[in-house]
Structure formats: structure tokens, C-alpha cells
Curated annotation (Swiss-Prot):
A motif (AMPK pseudosubstrate) lies at residues 138-159. The keyword ATP-binding applies. ATP 1 binds at R70, M85, L86, T87, I88, T89, D90, V130, H151, R152. This is 5'-AMP-activated protein kinase subunit gamma-1. AMP 1 binds at M85, L86, T87, I88, T89, D90, V130, H151, R152. The modification Phosphothreonine is found at T263. GO terms for cellular component: cytoplasm; cytosol; nucleotide-activated protein kinase complex; nucleus. Belongs to the 5'-AMP-activated protein kinase gamma subunit family. ADP 2 binds at R70, K170, S242, K243, F244, D245, R269, L277, H298, R299. ATP 2 binds at R70, R152, K170, S242, K243, F244, D245, R269, L277, H298, R299. Residues 43-103, 125-187, 198-260, 272-329 form the CBS domain. It comes from the Eukaryota.
Length: 330
């Protein structure tokens, strides 16, 4: 879905960060990010879907599915500017807010326009669009993603007002990984997760195999997490239910019955699902990063030797450690 092209697809990258400096190796990734612009990461060709705010919500979500994208910038033709993003989180919020039962159609999803939903959703807390210039550094992009607790950052040309690209944690880490072998390896890359304390290890939001989808949606809304480990009666992870899985309800037009279990809702991908991507506290940060990038996933579930969930390590956690804190716990 969010594959990043090979290094050949990117504009030529200047390796000025390789010059000898007195800085410690622990800051090489920070220096790299500060010396490269968002423009450097934009592939020569990529798909971008834009929605007008007058579009029906339902049509917009179907369009996300059809185009294989997870989010789209919103264009307000009255204001002649981009005003926000429509994401799978919006789909989850609408379903959770308006679902009554399998027998009652969700009128708001079927009939509302995007602008109507935004008026309802943002009435208590107007949030201006968080975006970035193509000339801003990747360090600024990572800082903005983490500071604003967002997963998508539109790159908007300040002169034309056009959206050029959508930056994500995954794309930034993949870009860094393309050049990572050229750096002297920082000391913290050889340290374990346990030593570095990267990730979340308290109050992990989880669901059981029998948990209804509607309850899972409520946990997404309340905890603002992007995935929920699915555990058995002994707390062992057997699956994972992510926000991206929820959009399948639109693909299959099954969003009118949210009383089914998450296990049943996940059956659609059983033929290609390779299992939950896991890691252990004793594994090094380097191993974790390689696994995340190669598997193209957004997080790993930290487990013990019995597969009991101990924590979650997300791309956001990794980028914060690599770029903002130099391997130190923030």
C-alpha cells in the first residue's frame, strides 16, 4: 500500500553528512535529517488522491479503498485552499459515533458530505491543517509528525499551494535506511530494546478474539492508537487489528454490522496474512529497524518467550529515538 521506491527513484542525494565532524556517532541520523529536505524524499512519480470537501463521506472512503491509499488532503473550493486530511481515523470516528445496530442504516455515513462531518467533528476543537514546505528539513518533518501526534504530513508548495506528497513515518524511515550503511554506526544501534526503553510498556490497549468490532473502534477512539494486539485467554498474541483493517469494512460494505468479532472481521486477509510481527526485549535496535523496514509494517508487538504481550514498538518510537533523542529515552 505504501511502498517506497528504490533509491534510484529519488533525486540525487548529496552526502555532505559524511564529512568528518567532531560530533559523536550518536547524532549522525539527526545530522542526516537536518541536511536533507522533504523534497529529497519525494519520488519522481507517486499517486496522490485529493477530495473536495463537498464530496459525500461514503464516496470518499470508497475512493480511499479503490486507490489503495490511507488518507487524502481535503480541498475547500470556497476557501480555495487545503483545509485538512481525511483519514481512516475519520471513518472509525463516524462509525463509532453513529452506529446503533446492524438493523439501522448509518445515515450520517450514507448522506453526509465531508464538510458536514468536519463541522460536527471539529465544533469543539478546530485543528488547522498541519503541513510542511518541500524546502523544510526532514528533521523538521519528523519533529512535526511526533509533536502533533499525526501519521501523515502533507508537503505543500508555498508558492503554488499544491500538495506534492504525503510524508509518513514509514517513508522517512525507509529513506533513512537506504543510506544507513554509509554512516558510522551509532553505539545505541547495538543496544537492546530493554536497555533503550523504546516503546510503550504500560497500559497496552488490547482486544480478545471475541471482542466485537464496535468495542475495538471505541478503544481506537479512546486510546488514539493505530493497532490493537488480539490476545487469547492467556494474554498471548494471536493476531493484530489495525486501523487499516477497519477500512475493509468499507471495501466489503459490511460497516452496518459492527457486532461481529474482530476475528471474524479479519478473515478477509487470512489467505495472505503471515502472522503477527513480533520482537523481544533482548533484541537490538538495529534488528528491530531491519524487521520493521523489510516487513513494511507500522509496529512490532513486544512479547516474552510465551508470546505474552509486553509492549508495542512503533515507527514513531523508532524515529523519535533515532532522530530526536539520539537513542536516549525522551
Amino acid at each position: 500500500m505504501e511502498a517506497v521506491p528504490s533509491s534510484d527513484s529519488y533525486p540525487a542525494v548529496e552526502n555532505e553528512h559524511l564529512q568528518e565532524t567532531p560530533e559523536s556517532n550518536n547524532s549522525v541520523y539527526t545530522s542526516f535529517m537536518k541536511s536533507h529536505r522533504c523534497y529529497d524524499l519525494i519520488p519522481t512519480s507517486s499517486k496522490l488522491v485529493v477530495f473536495d470537501t463537498s464530496l459525500q463521506v461514503k464516496k470518499a472512503f470508497f475512493a480511499l479503498v479503490t486507490n489503495g491509499v490511507r488518507a487524502a488532503p481535503l480541498w475547500d473550493s470556497k476557501k480555495q485552499s487545503f483545509v485538512g486530511m481525511l483519514t481512516i481515523t475519520d471513518f472509525i470516528n463516524i462509525l463509532h459515533r453513529y452506529y446503533k445496530s446492524a438493523l439501522v442504516q448509518i445515515y450520517e455515513l450514507e448522506e453526509h458530505k465531508i464538510e458536514t462531518w468536519r463541522e460536527v467533528y471539529l465544533q469543539d476543537s478546530f485543528k488547522p491543517l498541519v503541513c510542511i514546505s518541500p524546502n523544510a528539513s526532514l528533521f523538521d518533518a519528523v519533529s512535526s509528525l511526533i509533536r502533533n501526534k499525526i501519521h501523515r504530513l502533507p508537503v505543500i508548495d508555498p508558492e503554488s499551494g499544491n500538495t506534492l506528497y504525503i510524508l509518513t513515518h514509514k517513508r522517512i524511515l525507509k529513506f533513512l535506511k537506504l543510506f544507513i550503511t554509509e554512516f558510522p554506526k551509532p553505539e545505541f544501534m547495538s543496544k537492546s530494546l530493554e536497555e533503550l526503553q523504546i516503546g510503550t510498556y504500560a497500559n497496552i490497549a488490547m482486544v480478545r478474539t471475541t471482542t466485537p468490532v464496535y468495542v475495538a473502534l471505541g478503544i481506537f477512539v479512546q486510546h488514539r492508537v493505530s493497532a490493537l494486539p488480539v490476545v487469547d485467554e492467556k494474554g498471548r498474541v494471536v493476531d493484530i487489528y489495525s486501523k487499516f483493517d477497519v477500512i475493509n469494512l468499507a471495501a466489503e460494505k459490511t460497516y452496518n454490522n459492527l457486532d461481529v468479532s474482530v476475528t471474524k472481521a479479519l478473515q478477509h486477509r487470512s489467505h495472505y496474512f503471515e502472522g503477527v510481527l513480533k520482537c523481544y526485549l533482548h533484541e537490538t535496535l538495529e534488528t528491530i529497524i531491519n524487521r520493521l523496514v523489510e516487513a513494511e509494517v507500522h509496529r512490532l508487538v513486544v512479547v516474552d518467550e510465551n508470546d505474552v504481550v509486553k509492549g508495542i514498538v512503533s515507527l514513531s518510537d523508532i524515529l523519535q529515538a533515532l532522530v530526536l533523542t539520539g537513542g536516549e529515552k525522551p
